[in-house]
């Protein structure tokens, strides 16, 4: 299963990466984005898995795009749709 493979890969690197790029967002962000857009939130297995990663993983910035917007949701989560975001300048000052 892909999620188990992901966990095993992250175990090998001590749960530390520079950046995360996914289509979907972790559950808490997904729920807020659905609410803001007047959509029903249906929390699914992938969103819960991404929430697990978000809680455990050390990273500089997380980029996702499912919700068709362009904004920083907080200091490490960037919704990307049309913007071009140079990764070198992403989340300046954030550390893992």
Residue ranges of predicted features:
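Extended recognition/assembly regions associated with phosphoester-bond processing machinery
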Residues: 1-96
